[in-house]
Regions:
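Glycine-rich ATP/GTP-binding catalytic cores of kinases/NTPases
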Residues: 1-146
Length: 146
């Protein structure tokens, strides 16, 4: 399943994936056995390619992490557009780890997602939710920082 979620079979000359390819990513994820719901709010303004790519990759990595760490958890992907930002939030209903579990963000996945967001002038947080589950929340400016 992780191979399917991380699949990056784009030819070098094909355009980088963006939010326009989110339905395809969600279908691949569902076909791999993960239950995913998607909520989109607002109308997408014209976005720089870097913002499209960062949002897509953050969602892709989050889904990969759910498959790796939360098993068959249910996942909700939310994309919200406003005048200034694209907000991406990925929640799963997996169980929180017992005491002594690895700290959040010690792997390269969350670190890489955070780097993508901050490189564009945005931010990303990730952590366990009270009562169980995990949330990744990113804010990406509609216009990337100069």
């Amino acid at each position: 399943m992780l191979t399917t979620l991380r699949q990056d079979d784009d030819a070098p000359r094909s355009p980088a994936p963006g939010l326009d390819r989110l339905p395809e990513l969600i279908e691949l994820t569902r076909a791999a056995g993960l239950g995913v719901e998607v909520e989109i709010t607002g109308t997408a303004p014209p976005l720089p390619a870097a913002v499209h790519l960062a949002a897509y990759r953050i969602i892709q990595e989050s889904l990969t992490n759910v498959a790796r760490h939360a098993g068959r958890a249910r996942v909700t992907v939310r994309v919200t557009y406003d005048d200034a930002d694209v907000h991406v939030e990925i929640d799963d209903d997996g169980t929180a780890p017992s005491d002594g579990a690895a700290a959040v963000g010690t792997g390269s996945g969350i670190i890489g997602m955070r780097e993508r967001a901050t490189a564009l002038g945005g931010d990303l947080s990730a952590g366990f939710r009270p009562g169980g589950g995990f949330r990744v929340s990113a804010r990406l400016p509609v216009r990337s920082s100069p």
